[in-house]
Amino acid sequence: MQQTILAPDTADEALLTPQQALLTDDSEAILRFAVDALSAGMGAALVMLTGIRGGAARAVGAQMVVREDGGYCGFVSGGCVESAAAFEAMAALACVEDRVVRYGEGSPWFDIVLPCGGGITLHI
């Protein structure tokens, strides 16, 4: 699988908002992204799709990794919740606390609706 590395908007500043840093859904590359972040002294969070209600774009076990600077790689949906999930992961890193987040059906957020009409549960 071909991988594309995307540069942040500004090279001189740390990312303040989540931004995809590596475009891949290969689990080995996603975990390597985490190892590289940790080796560089940066915090990183693993986000895993652990539940599906109705339909979903990805299977249970899909992963993404989010660095403390907001850079992320991997997918847990068809692209509709990755940025929101990255914000949650950054918050989890900041308070050093795991969390469970739901999007779509059964979620507390009315403005994040999955195109497939279902819902997903993520563990961070």
Regions found by a protein language model. Name each.
Residues 1-124:
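Segments forming oxygen-rich coordination pockets for charged ligands
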